[in-house]
């Protein structure tokens, strides 16, 4: 059962104090089997209007992406959870306040549908991305991170969790938003859809 996680797995919120672990993960662990995405640093989804900034910046340079990540984490604009096994970082989940992220680069260019790019009256926590170490996939780490995020969102007064899985099956890399099956485990329900993605919600 994928929800029976290993006893040595721990989940921690990303804070400036865990910045070094975050950088180490993206520089040495996250994409060792996918050099195309090496050192991505997951800067596309964050709580700032960075669409024009990132479009003009030389984001093909990993050092530029690294600098943005450091700045965003120190300002609490890039949020989520880090997963550890035996105190070694093995996973990342990007999740943030939906309304705060409507004008970030990822929302505009990756979700890319104006119909759902509207401020919500409800308090909603969005799930944007998962990355798990290649040798740790299939062991329930993404499931554990999502479970923790749901628990915290409810405690923080959020009314819904929202997610954006691909409509069509694709490889694990382009399933970075989490596969549909992951959300079905936690009873996410269809809310609407875009051309390429389902929009799911879970009432908290």
Can you say where each PLM-predicted feature lies in the sequence?
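Conserved acyl-donor/pantetheine-binding loop and adjacent beta-alpha core of acyl/acetyltransferases
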Residues: 71, 75, 88-129, 174-176
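Conserved GNAT acetyl-CoA-binding A-motif
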Residues: 123-127, 137, 153-172
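Active-site rim helix/loop that mediates acceptor-substrate recognition in acyltransferases
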Residues: 40-78
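Conserved active-site alpha-helix within GNAT-family acetyltransferase domains
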Residues: 155-159, 168-193
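Conserved beta-hairpin
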Residues: 22, 78-93
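Short, solvent-exposed beta-strand-terminating loops
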Residues: 25-40, 93-105, 152-153
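Conserved N-terminal entry element of GNAT/NAT acetyltransferase domains
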Residues: 2-55
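Conserved acetyl-CoA-binding loop-helix of GNAT-fold acetyltransferases
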Residues: 127-132, 138-154
């Amino acid at each position: 059962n994928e929800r029976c996680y290993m006893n040595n797995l721990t989940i921690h919120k990303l804070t400036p104090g865990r910045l070094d672990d975050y950088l180490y993960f993206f520089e040495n662990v996250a994409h060792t089997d996918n050099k195309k995405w090496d050192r991505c640093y997951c800067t596309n989804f964050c709580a700032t209007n960075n669409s024009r900034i990132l479009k003009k910046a030389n984001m093909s340079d990993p050092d530029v992406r690294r600098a943005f990540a450091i700045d965003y984490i120190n300002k609490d604009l890039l949020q989520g959870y880090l997963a550890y096994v035996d105190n070694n970082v093995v996973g990342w989940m990007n999740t943030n306040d939906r309304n705060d992220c409507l004008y970030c680069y990822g929302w505009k260019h990756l979700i890319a549908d104006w119909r759902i790019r509207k401020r919500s009256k409800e308090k909603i926590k969005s799930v944007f991305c998962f990355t798990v170490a290649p040798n740790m996939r299939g062991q329930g780490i993404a499931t554990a991170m999502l479970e923790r995020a749901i628990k915290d969102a409810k405690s923080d007064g959020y009314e819904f969790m929202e997610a954006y899985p691909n409509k069509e099956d694709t490889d694990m890399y382009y399933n970075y938003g989490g596969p549909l099956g992951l959300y079905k485990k936690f009873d996410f329900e269809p809310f609407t859809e875009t051309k390429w993605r389902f929009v799911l919600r879970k009432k908290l």
